[in-house]
C-alpha cells in the first residue's frame, strides 16, 4: 500500500503551497456542517460529529473555528452540500476516484471534467472504476521515538488488518467498521496520528514511467486537491514518489 498513503498526499501538498492549511480548514468545515445538519450539534449524541471534531483538532484546526462552523450549521445555514463521488482515468490508465461535497453539482462536474481532459485523462460514468477499489480505514502514525515492532503489535491488538512501517511513520489499515476504535486505541497508547480517513484503496496499481504522463498526473492531482468542492482523491498510481515536485 505504500504510495497510496493520504499522509503522503498531504505532505506533498503542504510542500507545494502555503494555502494548504486554509484548504484543510475549508474541507473539514464542510464535513462538520453536514454532520451537524444530519445528526445535530451535540458531539455526545452525534458520533460522526465527535469523530470529525477530533480529526479537525489533529489537523490543527483552531477550536474557535470548529465551534463557529457548528454554530453556523446549527443556526440554519441554507447552504446544502451534496456528497457525490466522481470516477475516471488519469494519464496511462490510472484509476481515480474523487469524493466531493458540493452545493452545485453542475459546476463541480464541469470543473473536474476540465481537469481530466486537460491532463490526459477522462471523467467517466459512475461505477467505471469503483470496482477496482476497496474501502478501508487508513491511519498514519508517527514512529518517532517508537519501536516499529511494538507499534505493529499495538495496532494489531487494537483491531488493525495491516501495518506498513517506513523510517519514521507507519500506515495502519483497518476494516471500515473498526476504523474509529483503532484510532482511539492508538491515541490512548500515546501514538501521534498524522492523518486518518476512510480511504478507497486500489486492489491493483498502475506504474507510470513516461515523464510526460507523470507530469500530467501530478498536475491532475494538484488541480483536484486545490478545488474546494473536493474532499478526497484516491488513485491507483503505484509510484507516486516519482511525481515531479
Language-model features, listed with the residues they occupy:
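Positively charged, low-complexity, intrinsically disordered RNA-binding extensions
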Residues: 138-245
Amino acid at each position: 500500500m505504500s504510495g497510496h498513503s493520504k499522509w503522503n498526499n498531504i505532505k506533498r501538498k503542504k510542500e507545494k503551497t502555503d494555502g494548504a492549511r486554509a484548504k484543510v480548514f475549508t474541507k473539514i468545515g464542510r464535513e462538520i456542517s453536514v454532520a451537524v445538519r444530519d445528526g445535530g450539534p451535540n458531539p455526545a449524541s452525534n458520533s460522526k460529529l465527535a469523530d470529525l471534531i477530533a480529526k479537525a483538532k489533529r489537523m490543527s484546526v483552531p477550536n474557535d473555528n470548529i465551534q463557529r462552523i457548528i454554530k453556523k450549521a446549527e443556526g440554519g445555514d441554507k447552504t446544502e452540500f451534496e456528497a457525490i463521488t466522481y470516477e475516471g482515468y488519469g494519464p496511462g490508465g490510472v484509476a481515480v476516484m474523487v469524493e466531493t461535497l458540493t452545493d452545485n453539482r453542475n459546476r463541480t462536474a464541469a470543473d473536474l471534467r476540465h481537469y481530466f481532459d486537460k491532463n490526459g485523462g477522462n471523467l467517466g460514468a459512475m461505477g467505471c472504476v469503483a470496482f477496482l477499489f476497496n474501502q478501508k480505514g487508513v491511519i498514519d502514525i508517527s514512529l518517532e521515538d517508537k519501536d516499529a515492532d511494538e507499534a505493529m503489535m499495538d495496532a494489531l491488538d487494537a483491531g488493525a488488518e495491516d501495518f506498513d512501517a517506513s523510517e519514521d511513520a507507519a500506515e495502519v489499515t483497518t476494516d471500515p467498521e473498526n476504523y474509529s476504535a483503532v484510532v482511539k486505541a492508538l491515541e490512548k497508547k500515546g501514538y501521534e496520528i498524522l492523518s486518518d480517513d476512510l480511504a478507497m484503496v486500489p486492489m491493483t496499481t498502475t506504474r507510470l514511467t513516461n515523464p510526460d504522463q507523470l507530469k500530467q498526473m501530478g498536475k491532475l492531482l494538484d488541480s483536484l486537491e486545490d478545488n474546494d468542492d473536493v474532499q478526497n482523491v484516491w488513485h491507483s498510481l503505484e509510484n507516486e514518489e516519482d511525481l515531479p515536485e
